[in-house]
Amino acid sequence: MSMAYEEYMRQLVVPMRRELTGAGFEELTTAEEVENFMEKAEGTTLVVVNSVCGCAAGLARPAATQAVLQNDKTPDNTVTVFAGQDKEATAKMREYFTGQEPSSPSMALLKGKEVVHFIPRHEIEGHDMEEIMKNLTAAFDAHC
């Protein structure tokens, strides 16, 4: 790929990253950052696998941020990796999603290192934001 294309893509996704980091999500951009986080992670963690697609922009990111900001029970940690952008970090995080097919966007609620709830792309695409938020908040209420 050309350097101009890579720079264009880096700039294009800045607001997509900020939508989550601005709501308090920690962005993990390397495999090492994922490993370091997962080694020390305690309690519950919501992981958002971010994406450039429309269902990430219109549904996944807003549902994740609003669920975390509005629900009484929330995860101890909120982190994000960006599929297609931070490939090694995303691949490393997906290693922890045992039994789940790679999907972006997607969301995983972990207790320690174990996935206790997973929302793949097909449960995001074609659903409205409120449905996705209810899916997340029900998981928060059950596990956080």
From Swiss-Prot:
Disulfide bonds join 53-55. One of its GO terms (molecular function) is oxidoreductase activity. The modification S-bacillithiol cysteine disulfide is found at residue 53. A motif (CXC active site motif) lies at residues 53-55. Pfam families: Disulph_isomer (PF06491). Induction: Expression is up-regulated by cumene hydroperoxide (CHP). InterPro entries: BrxB/BrxA. Gene3D superfamilies: 6.10.250.2150, Glutaredoxin. Belongs to the bacilliredoxin family. S-bacillithiolation is the formation of mixed disulfide bonds between protein thiols and the general thiol reductant bacillithiol (BSH) under oxidative stress. BSH is an equivalent of glutathione (GSH) in Firmicutes. This protein is a dithiol bacilliredoxin, which debacillithiolates (removes BSH) the S-bacillithiolated OhrR (OhrR-SSB) in vitro and in vivo NaOCl-generated S-bacillithiolated MetE (MetE-SSB). Involved in maintaining redox homeostasis in response to disulfide stress conditions. Has a redox potential of -130 mV. Displays weak protein disulfide isomerase activity in vitro. This is Bacilliredoxin BrxA.
